[in-house]
């Protein structure tokens, strides 16, 4: 550097002396660091030194202790010999401490406290909060699936009861005798609500071309007109009171 214009003429000599002294101290410090780095890569580490090289990895209080007072050290370094030798020969960096070593010692806290301490950052808190929302939604889905399953079970039970009721109605009608054979045939054709397919209705309604209502085209010759048949269970000829009486009778027989 050119120090010709550095300061005025009165203090120039003092400044030059100061700069030279600082430069000389800096060069000596660099030379000392080079020698120390070179000697740390040799197998004779620590023979010509008053302090051990391993103490650079220890706490500051142990670092100041001389070689002769090594017995005063409380605990030995947790690093094994192989890792310590690698650190001496290759100047490798120390591995990061385990997560539980941050803050207070792990022996004074439970695992739950350490987990809470790990998740104290805002990012991790948001992450775990979203995970809690996902878990709640999964529980709600399972709850809804349970409700659907229960409703399906109820529907299955009702279906089985309706099937039993229909079979009981058919059996009770068949026990009335041969005089109600036509009504028995009619009742077997009824399953559920009346539809066009069930009763074989014609396009013109109950009467078509001035002919009375018949069951279907294939039964015209076998069956007579409905108004000529004597039946006690024709739905279109029975009153609401008779239908309710039959239903009450069927339920009383089931119970």
Swiss-Prot record:
The modification Phosphoserine is found at residue 65. Pfam families: Spc29. GO terms for biological process: spindle pole body duplication. Its main location: nucleus. InterPro entries: Spc29 (IPR031392). Keywords: Cytoplasm, Cytoskeleton, Nucleus, Phosphoprotein. Residues 1-12 have a biased composition (Polar residues). Transmembrane segments: none annotated. The keyword Phosphoprotein applies. The keyword S-adenosyl-L-methionine does not apply. MPS1-mediated phosphorylation at Thr-240 is required for spindle pole body duplication. GO terms for cellular component: central plaque of spindle pole body; cytoplasm; nucleus. It is found in: Nucleus; Cytoplasm, Cytoskeleton, Microtubule organizing center, Spindle pole body. The modification Phosphothreonine is found at residues 18, 240. GO terms for molecular function: structural constituent of cytoskeleton. Residues 1-20, 31-123, 210-231 are annotated as: Disordered. Residues 69-91, 211-231 have a biased composition (Basic and acidic residues). Component of the spindle pole body (SPB) required for the proper execution of spindle pole body (SPB) duplication. Links the central plaque component SPC42 to the inner plaque component SPC110. Belongs to the SPC29 family. Component of the SPC110 complex containing at least CMD1, SPC29, SPC42 and SCP110. Interacts with BBP1. This is Spindle pole component 29. It comes from Saccharomyces cerevisiae (strain AWRI796) (Baker's yeast). The lineage of its organism: Eukaryota, Fungi, Dikarya, Ascomycota, Saccharomycotina. The gene is SPC29.
